[in-house]
């Protein structure tokens, strides 16, 4: 079963209304479970939420996005701040907030070979291009935290 069919199934079971647009996986999403696009009505979902938290949590994320979807097309308040949205979300047992990932991003540590200053970065530094900002000495990777 593809994602659009799954979202339509959830919509019919939990809202008794069809989902008439498309649903897509969007691997660029990081902190959110999904997004609703009012302009064309499609939904994007974060595949990491499904992989990390499982089917039941993902179903609750789908319900959350479907609340936005159905309220928008009914002409009611579909934003998080609207009472219509809050009521419908509670009624269908959707998630209010996306769960936080338990995986921590690793950091990379660099040390200047001349003055010993340490730099902590989340992204790699091109050691051929960049130097220490204090003494212009060469940098060296000293260790990398585990993901």
UniProtKB/Swiss-Prot annotation:
Its main location: cytoplasm. Zn(2+) binds at residues 64, 68. One of its GO terms (cellular component) is cytoplasm. It is found in: Cytoplasm. InterPro entries: SprT-like_domain (IPR006640), Uncharacterised_SprT-like (IPR023524). The keyword Iron-sulfur does not apply. It comes from the Bacteria. The keyword Zinc applies. HAMAP family: SprT_like (MF_00745). Belongs to the SprT family. This is Protein SprT-like. It comes from Streptococcus uberis (strain ATCC BAA-854 / 0140J).
